[in-house]
């Protein structure tokens, strides 16, 4: 159900170790990417030049660390205020986008096939499956908590895709900061960018800390999360991350097969593999099937 530790169970530890390590790697990557994208948007809105971008990285990182140190159990009111503000501002943006029918229209191109776009879009929510379970694993009613999380996440994700596509068509821009500026949401846009970046990236960093505990039980997840945030800030300052296509393919190659095999085994084949430390057959199927898909992508017109 999740990648959190089950201490004393050697086989369980072996099974979860590989995906725990991969999960930490992808969460560190997401932390850096989110901070990088957030800093670009903040700097674009405030127009502070080259220095402004790394200052924005540090400020966003500091806010994420604050969220982590406050602790998930004490974030109730803070998260409620942040989410309410973000929700209201997003609705304001929706009214502007859908109330304005005079958009310029963004020209399409053939830089990415429809299938590739779908695959990369699916890779993101699939990579969040281990993250979601880090927050639902201790729920009093795990099934209801997981179902509610999945439905809400899916609905909001579709909403965000619609907003992004519509805003891009309206303004002729793909840069979220420029879209917000053209939408007349300069200050409100700044608040949206900062709140969405901090609240989302907090989840990445915190989950990386939780997953690290399943690799080394003596580690404290909160402090690992802080370290992950610091690494993310440094990476966001040093490395350009404008094109994350390869990163999305990487996590897609891990988490799409993982959940596909899990669903097929548990719900369709009804196989109980709890007694096995590692299922060699599934491990082999994983890279072979994904390599085959990538090799025949053009033939399938995806």
Model-derived segments and spans:
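Single conserved hydrophobic/aromatic residue that forms the stacking wall/gate
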Residues: 2-9, 13, 292, 299-301
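Transmembrane helix-loop boundary segments of multi-pass membrane transporters
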Residues: 10-14, 41-56, 73-82, 176-188, ...
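Hydrophobic transmembrane alpha-helices that form the core helical bundles
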Residues: 16-48, 198-214
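Transmembrane alpha-helical segments of multi-pass small-molecule transport proteins
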Residues: 17-24, 45-70, 84-94, 114-130, ...
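Membrane-water interface regions at transmembrane-helix termini and the short interhelical loops
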Residues: 37-47, 61-82, 100, 134-140, ...
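Membrane-interface loop-to-helix entry segments
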Residues: 55, 59, 64-97, 108-109, ...
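Hydrophobic, membrane-embedded alpha-helices of multi-pass small-molecule transporters
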Residues: 96-100, 108-169, 181-202, 277-290
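C-terminal membrane-solvent junction of multi-pass transporters and transport-like membrane proteins
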Residues: 261-302
